[in-house]
């Protein structure tokens, strides 16, 4: 079944508690100022449903830093909340929102920022949200940048993580929803190995024509720099699979272009997920294998760090999704400078 549309780098393609303590889908949070109003759209099957994606840059270089920022009336967070209150999407992906295992940052942002009027906008309440661990900042124990040492300080430490980051959870993701989230149908692919992707773009060292990664490292390297999530949203029109990710920028490397190759393959993963052919390799973090059923409705969203025309990415990277037969073909919203 074909679904939504797209922009370039920031992409939108439309086509309770977990048993895992690190994964949370909150329901009806205890709002600070007022009880959330009734959501008429939950009982209406005729109303349009609005999905959105937003890179918030709500991150800190320090572990727990975002929680401390939000606890101290952060000006940037208030401005971001005002934008969300003005646009009022039903389902929203926030990229670059630091993950913490207790969900404190998400709770504070929901209650103290979205749940209170910002810049004259009406407060907005999301009864459901989803957070889960990401690969950024999780040390791999490998010398992934080939500088002769494992870990270190600053960027050296970040480069040797499974996804670039200075602490686990940096640059994470957060999904907000007006509708319930079905955790049994929700999937994550944080641990999927890059080597298992068919036709993976294995980086080469151009100076030696040898593989950039040592064989033992390539065998352990994860594909997703943050994570890939299939979040099952129970809308009045039925389940919609919210396919969200934040591929690594195709820069900050060297002539081997290891980040360009990874960006290409992180985006390719969604193309393979939509194809759903010969997917015995495509196993989620619960070890359930397979792609998206052909009759499933979906939205693909995220900061893809890729453009079909410009930029530093591998040519054709975004076309893997834009030209996919399951993706709807109609004009995406646009504005000068994507503002």
For the regions a language model picked out, list residue spans one by one:
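C-terminal motif of bacterial Sec signal peptides marking the signal peptidase cleavage site
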Residues: 13-15
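Metal-dependent phosphoester/phosphodiester hydrolase catalytic core
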Residues: 192-279
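Sec-dependent signal peptide recognition
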Residues: 2-7
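Flexible, glycine-/basic-rich loop-and-beta segments that form/coincide
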Residues: 181-193
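Short, solvent-exposed loop/turn segments at secondary-structure junctions
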Residues: 58-59, 99, 136, 181, ...
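Structural recognition of the beta-strand scaffold that forms the well-ordered cores
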Residues: 50-53, 90-95, 128-131, 173-177, ...
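Metal-dependent phosphoesterases centered on the DNase I-like endonuclease/exonuclease/phosphatase
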Residues: 119, 128, 241, 248-339
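N-terminal, active-site-proximal structural segment of metallo-dependent hydrolase catalytic domains
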Residues: 17-175, 202-220, 236-240, 255, ...
């Amino acid at each position: 079944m074909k679904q939504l549309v797209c922009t370039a780098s920031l992409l939108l393609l439309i086509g309770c508690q977990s048993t895992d303590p690190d994964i949370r889908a909150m329901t009806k949070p205890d709002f600070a100022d007022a009880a959330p109003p009734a959501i008429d759209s939950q009982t209406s099957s005729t109303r349009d449903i609005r999905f959105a994606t937003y890179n918030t840059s709500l991150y800190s270089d320090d572990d727990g830093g975002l929680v401390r920022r939000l606890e101290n009336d952060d000006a940037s967070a208030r401005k971001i909340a005002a934008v969300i209150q003005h646009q009022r999407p039903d389902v929203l992906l926030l990229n670059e929102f630091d993950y913490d295992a207790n969900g404190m940052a998400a709770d504070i942002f929901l209650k103290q920022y979205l749940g209170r009027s910002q810049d004259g906008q009406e407060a907005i309440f999301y009864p459901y949200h989803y957070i889960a661990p990401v690969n950024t900042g999780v040390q791999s124990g490998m010398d992934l940048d080939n500088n002769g040492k494992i870990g270190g300080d600053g960027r050296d430490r970040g480069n040797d993580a499974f996804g670039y980051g200075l602490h686990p959870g940096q640059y994470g993701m957060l999904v907000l929803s007006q509708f319930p989230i079905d955790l049994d149908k929700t999937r994550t692919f944080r641990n999927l190995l890059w080597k298992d992707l068919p036709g993976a773009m294995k980086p080469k060292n151009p100076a030696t024509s040898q593989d950039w990664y040592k064989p033992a490292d390539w065998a352990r390297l994860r594909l997703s720099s943050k994570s890939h999530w299939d979040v099952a949203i129970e809308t009045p029109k039925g389940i919609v699979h919210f396919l969200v990710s934040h591929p690594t920028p195709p820069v900050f490397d060297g002539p081997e272009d290891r980040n360009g190759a990874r960006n290409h393959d992180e985006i390719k993963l969604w193309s393979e997920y939509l194809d759903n052919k010969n997917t015995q390799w495509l196993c989620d973090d619960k070890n359930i294998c397979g792609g998206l059923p052909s009759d499933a409705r979906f939205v693909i969203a995220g900061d893809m760090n890729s453009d079909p025309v410009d930029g530093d990415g591998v040519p054709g990277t975004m076309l893997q999704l834009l030209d996919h037969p399951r993706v709807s073909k109609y004009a995406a919203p646009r504005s000068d400078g994507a503002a």
